[in-house]
Amino acid sequence: MVVVSVPAEVTVILLDIEGTTTPIAFVKDILFPYIKENVKEYLQTHWEEEECQQDVSLLRKQAEEDAHLDGAVPIPVASGGDVQQMIQAVVDNVSWQMSHDRKTTALKQLQGHMWKAAFTAGRMKAEVFADVVPAVRRWREAGMKVYIYSSGSVEAQKLLFGHSTEGDILELIDGHFDTKIGHKVESDSYRKIADSIGCSTNNILFLTDVTVEASAAEEADVHVAVVVRPGNAGLTDDEKTYYNLISSFSELYLPSTQSKV
């Protein structure tokens, strides 16, 4: 087994989600397809609710901004007309946005509400790799703080870790960051995270599967290890040589405690 020693000054472990704590396949093959497969039923069930109407209004506004794009799907203004026709327009718009991998606030808001309903109803559980929870428990016992940094919203992060295949594991997480603090490929984001936590950047070890993020973190003087999981993007030979690589959280070692973390 490969063992990566955690530098003695590290007191915070910062975790990516997709491809690090959670299989990419769960996000790609379960989480996002769930939206496409269930959006019509969700809208029909919740159409009269204020939250749903706010989501639709935001999507309509986005559709107006997208009107100049090829293939964009308009959403008609609410009237006394056919509700099913309105719902179908929203379904078609969502499908179009997702097929183009759009990350609009309007789309993310509806997706977040749909996932919340699915998780709380027990229709879905978030997968985490088997090595994650035991390792995080050991890190915390060793005095480490553990934070999440993901492009998914903090609300979505809490849904995932609150309804995981390992149960509700939110108690193991000290805090959450999303792109409101900055994008993961920008080094300044990691400085802001350190400021928010109240530590130096070199007190942080960031675990991610994306080398562009690892590089940005390193520029901010954050320690990094690149996580190699099934389904993750391949690494170049140079990246394999340059970065500390782990395929399991159990491969991290805390010299200060003389125990594998």
Swiss-Prot record:
Signal peptide: none annotated. Pathway: Amino-acid biosynthesis; L-methionine biosynthesis via salvage pathway; L-methionine from S-methyl-5-thio-alpha-D-ribose 1-phosphate: step 3/6; Amino-acid biosynthesis; L-methionine biosynthesis via salvage pathway; L-methionine from S-methyl-5-thio-alpha-D-ribose 1-phosphate: step 4/6. Substrate binds at S150, S151, K184. Mg(2+) binds at D16, E18, D209. Pfam families: Hydrolase. It is found in: Cytoplasm; Nucleus. It is an enzyme of class 3 (hydrolase). Keywords: Amino-acid biosynthesis, Cytoplasm, Hydrolase, Magnesium, Metal-binding, Methionine biosynthesis, Nucleus. GO terms for molecular function: acireductone synthase activity; magnesium ion binding. CDD domains: HAD_EP. It catalyses: 5-methylsulfanyl-2,3-dioxopentyl phosphate + H2O = 1,2-dihydroxy-5-(methylsulfanyl)pent-1-en-3-one + phosphate. Gene3D superfamilies: 1.10.720.60, HAD superfamily/HAD-like. One of its GO terms (biological process) is L-methionine salvage from methylthioadenosine. Its cofactor is Mg(2+). Its EC number is 3.1.3.77. Binds 1 Mg(2+) ion per subunit. GO terms for cellular component: cytoplasm; nucleus. Belongs to the HAD-like hydrolase superfamily. MasA/MtnC family. Bifunctional enzyme that catalyzes the enolization of 2,3-diketo-5-methylthiopentyl-1-phosphate (DK-MTP-1-P) into the intermediate 2-hydroxy-3-keto-5-methylthiopentenyl-1-phosphate (HK-MTPenyl-1-P), which is then dephosphorylated to form the acireductone 1,2-dihydroxy-3-keto-5-methylthiopentene (DHK-MTPene). Monomer. NCBIfam families: enolase-ppase (TIGR01691), HAD-SF-IA-v1 (TIGR01549). This is Enolase-phosphatase E1. The lineage of its organism: Eukaryota, Metazoa, Chordata, Craniata, Vertebrata.
